[in-house]
């Protein structure tokens, strides 16, 4: 497919990501049936009672093929064996401090290898998680408390489905599980750009074997 916006034309295929600034029109077209997962700032603007004045960044395109190549390289590196997450962070040169795709939104492409668990973590940004590819047996546990082993107590289970999205609420612990026989890929999009700017992200990770917390600086 392709998108015409801001005087540019973007040619895209399955898994590609692009961001467009406010204002102007975007015309999307495709020779075959296509679905776009669209996340935008309208709820925030509506809550504040404001409208956009000017664009604050240029359009940016992220190739899924390039991101997957980088992700595979990271996943095969032994240094990542003990990492809480294995992912490629999508960035924009306009936002070097927040390391986000827009001034408000953060995105990354992550892999959850077959048979692995991404241990509980939490943050004050809300996460809109898009399941890029997965098999039955992939799910997320969500809850407010940890047990003595640092896992979620009495959590809610949200099963993944390829092409579907789920929400992890702000401040809730969540862990990702892959009990299938195939690697899974997920694209979380968060309002972490806004929280990073306000210094309110407050991300924390559970420690293995105990319920106290490890905070990032």
What would you call each of these model-derived segments?
Residues 121, 138-141, 150-151, 176, ...:
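Extended hydrophobic-aromatic, low-complexity segments
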Residues 1-14, 131-162:
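A short beta-strand-loop-beta hairpin characteristic of the jelly-roll/cupin
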Residues 15-18, 145-150, 155-157, 165, ...:
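Short amphipathic alpha-helical linker/capping segments at the junctions of internal repeats
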Residues 11-32, 39-42, 158-180, 186-191:
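Conserved metal-binding segment of the jelly-roll/cupin
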Residues 82-127:
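A short glycine-rich, His/Asp/Glu-containing loop-to-beta-strand
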Residues 37, 108-110, 129, 187:
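Conserved hydrophobic/aromatic positions in well-ordered beta-strands
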Residues 31-80, 177-217:
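Double-stranded beta-helix
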Residues 124, 132, 142-144, 169-172, ...:
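Active-site proximal loops enriched in glycine and acidic residues that flank catalytic Cys/His/Asp
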């Amino acid at each position: 497919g392709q998108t015409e916006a801001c005087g540019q034309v973007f040619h895209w295929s399955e898994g590609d990501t692009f961001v467009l600034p406010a204002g102007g029109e975007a015309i999307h077209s495709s020779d075959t049936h296509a679905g776009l997962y669209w996340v935008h700032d309208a709820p925030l603007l509506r809550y504040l009672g404001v409208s956009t004045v000017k664009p604050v960044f240029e359009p940016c395109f992220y190739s899924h093929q390039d991101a997957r190549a980088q992700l595979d390289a990271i996943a095969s590196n032994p240094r990542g064996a003990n990492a809480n997450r294995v992912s490629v962070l999508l960035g924009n040169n306009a936002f070097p401090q927040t390391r986000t795709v827009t001034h408000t939104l953060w995105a990354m492409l992550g892999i959850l290898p077959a048979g692995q668990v991404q241990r509980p973590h939490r943050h004050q940004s809300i996460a809109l998680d898009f399941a890029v590819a997965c098999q039955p047996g992939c799910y997320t546990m969500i809850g407010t408390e940890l047990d003595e082993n640092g896992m979620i107590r009495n959590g809610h289970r949200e099963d993944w489905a390829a092409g579907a999205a789920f929400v992890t609420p702000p401040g809730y612990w969540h862990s990702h599980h892959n009990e299938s026989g195939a690697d899974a890929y997920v694209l979380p999009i968060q309002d972490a750009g806004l929280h990073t700017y306000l210094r309110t992200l407050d991300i924390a990770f559970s420690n293995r074997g105990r319920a106290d917390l490890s905070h990032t600086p």
